[in-house]
Amino acid sequence: MLVPPDMMAAQTRMVYQMNRFCTERVQARMYKTATAIREICKIVQDILKEVELQEPRFISSLVECNGRFEGVEVISPNEFEIVLYLNQMGVFNFVDDGTLPGCAVLKLSDGRKRSMSLWVEFITASGYLSSRKIRARFQTLVAQACDKSVYRDMVKMVGDTSEVKLRIRERFVVQITPAFKCSGIWPRSAAHWPVPHLPWPHPNIVAEVKTEGFDLLSKESVIMQNKNNNAASMEGDAWVLSFFEAENRLLQGGCRRRCLSMLKTLRDRHLDLPGNPISAYHLKNLLLYECEKHPRDFEWDEGCIADRINGIFLQLISCLQYRRCPHYFLPALDMFKGKSPSALEQAAKQVWRLTRELLTNANAFEKL
């Protein structure tokens, strides 16, 4: 098919501008983030070392590999989450019946005695391994470790939460989340995935993702807000499902990861709004939906990235207007749950302003 020269020139100019945006804005963000991660991980490693001395069941899994710290997720430029993997989940059954969207429970296997578990004192009368009880114990240990740390003058525990959050140098907030890795099984609530008859992702990658599995995190969930006491008590024992590694594996190939880096940079520069209605994780999920709409690798080459970003922002506007953003793997889970309607409304207007600029101004990336 013949393409008009002026159209080719416009696309070439757009690619040039996006490459420049990546060099000047995205790389700067990545460098700043990497510097922050190195700084906070050095401090957190010291604290976790002390925790392990006090309680050997909490073994630090925060290790540097090829210059990167594994298990660190960037929530925003100044907010991070570090996952601490726990051992010996084996005597528990994974129960995922959809009662709590985005959550599951760990129940003592039939015929297994409590004494067979490494986590015996955190098992409830009903035989559930309590996420909340483990977190409470871990929080106490981290608070004690902070008091003993050589970094104690620059680290404070964040109060008014059951989660383990540290404020470092008054600049960064780091959440340390105990977790179990669940390999070789796949949750029933994500059984619909992958969508049948779509060419993406390739069956080999699907098999890889399902073998790798998912994580169960000990953290608070907004799902149970305004629920009755019994449900809230059950929620305290429940674990939050996380597909962090699976998501990252799916975004390999083409310019998908580059697209995510650009979206995160645009979010930090233009969509960092009061109430945090739009997070980098929302954009990551919408990017995965966009991968289904555009399953071929050639649709993710550098000449198509602008179209993909526009498509993701149009999806985002629709989600903000309907006040619902379904999780990619767990569509019953609304990621806007707990966000104020006014914050979502203001966010929709801001995303539309940004999208309109991208759609109507051929030189938009020069200013963004």
From Swiss-Prot:
Instruction: Give the InterPro entries listed for this entry.
Output: Mab-21-like_nuc_Trfase (IPR046903), Mab-21_HhH/H2TH-like (IPR046906), MAB21L/cGLR (IPR024810)
GO CC entries: cytoplasm; nucleus
Q: Which GO terms describe its biological process?
A: eye development
Family named by the database record: Belongs to the mab-21 family.
Q: Under what name is this protein listed? A: Protein mab-21-like
Q: Which organism is it from?
A: Drosophila melanogaster
